[in-house]
Amino acid sequence: PAGRKGMQPQIAISYSSAGGNGIMGKGFDISYGSCITTDTRFGLPKYDTNDTYMLDGILLSEKSRTETTITYQPKREAAFSRIIRFLDDNHWEVTDKSGTKRIYKQDEKSCVGYGQETFTWNLTKIVDVHKNTVIYEYNDFEEDAAGYVYPTAIYYTGYDETKGNYSIKFNYDENGIRRQDVRVDARSKKFVVCKKLLTSITTHYNDGDPIRKYTFTYKEGLAKENLLVSLTVSNNADESYTYTFDYNDPETDSNGNVIYFADTQEWYMGKDNPLQITNSTSIGKNNNASAGVGYGTKCIDGRITGGVSGSSGEGETYSEDSIVDINGDG
């Protein structure tokens, strides 16, 4: 359901064949909020407030700082938002041109790491100028504060500090099944392990029965990776429809073993060697000679000169194998 003044969460599911492995298996990803994370392209974090940060993948640069705050701006400005990090309680606030504020609170459940060694801050609250709110809740399901952060609920249509009546809840496999394709990330200098699968998303009013439910079904691929095979949408009237997803599995032999490489194909042009062999030889010589006789009086010098010079050169080049991309497939 829609929120007030457009204040409702935006949730989207996307797929990329080059995508990684997360809470929706390999290739699929879900966007539901926002995050500020430490940039590790050029090294691990130092956790000294001088690290470089990224807002939803956009690189930030420091603009100014005081004893209690640091102001940042995107290196490529587009949204013209005010981005401030508050050092006292280690949280961020991003305010856009309309006055809507996004808050990234320091919290053991919503952050990767904690305190001085916080690596990622996830969005915890959105509030507009009319005090309408969207509140995000998380759970790392781990005693260690560096565990993977899973979204668990989003409440909207709230006002000020009060949670909204409408909510979206994220449900995970709770039957103790251990994923064979767990993802381990150590960029924060600690092991962050993603080992749960998102099994359904439900929408509620006043935390009652689901208004609508989105159920995700997975299968295990040949490499033990989890692959999303269906998405079923149902409502409280038991009406539903399903989207299915198919994958092209690698070719296997008669024993079920994956064929990683095809048989070798030879391109033969009727020569002794299937690949062309080239040879070339060059020889060069150069000789010259010169002589001279001169005569003079007392005032005129006379001399005899002579000289001989010569040069020669010889070279040979050859190519034993000439590998050519014949069919142009790289």
Predicted segments with their positions:
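Conserved catalytic cores of ATP-dependent inositol ring kinases
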Residues: 1-300, 320-330
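N-terminal export/ancillary region detector
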Residues: 301, 305-317, 321-322
